Amino acid sequence: DLLAKELIKVMDGQIENVYYKSETTLPYKSETDKEDGYLIGSANEADFIAIENGLKFKADWIKGQKTGFFVDQRDNRALLEHYAKDKDVLNMFCYTGGFSFYAMRGGAKSVTSVDSSAKAIELTKENVELNFPGDTRHKAEATDAFKFLDDMKDGEYDLIILDPPAFAKHRDVLKRALNGYKKLNAKAFEKIRKGGILFTFSCSQA
């Protein structure tokens, strides 16, 4: 509560709401035992929209994954934009589609967004219309990532993004997680177009 009040003071009126969230984001129980909720302000019926480098993203900080929008990937998204021109881009585990929109703005020939969550895919489609209304370069598919990689043709994409959810939140599943990452990346290397670029990330905490 004290930190929230200081944020309001330092930002001089630029912050209207502060939401505390840890129960559904941490792999362990917070020592404070504080329930998720608003520290300052309250829920607004209007959609929350994050603006990053001129692009807009609908997000759900209450029910969405972690904080609803992964700002830690901001620099990587901006980097990808510079490699996307005239590329066929595949964004795996796309969630709200962040990497996809940077690729589109960077001049990608085509962009495919894949996520196992139908809700995430719907949000991605909404964000496409928010930033690039009527743009036919983008398509989205709700399906398992490993199945999609297995089924796709070799050399179909020359830029692939792998940003999966945590495979290991605890050390007791670390070995299985490492095998999962190896399998995922090996399959991407196998399928990517010759001379292509792979952006790969891991958020596992083990």
Predicted regions, residues:
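Non-catalytic substrate-recognition/targeting regions of SAM-dependent transferases
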Residues: 2-69
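Rossmann-like S-adenosyl-L-methionine
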Residues: 42-206
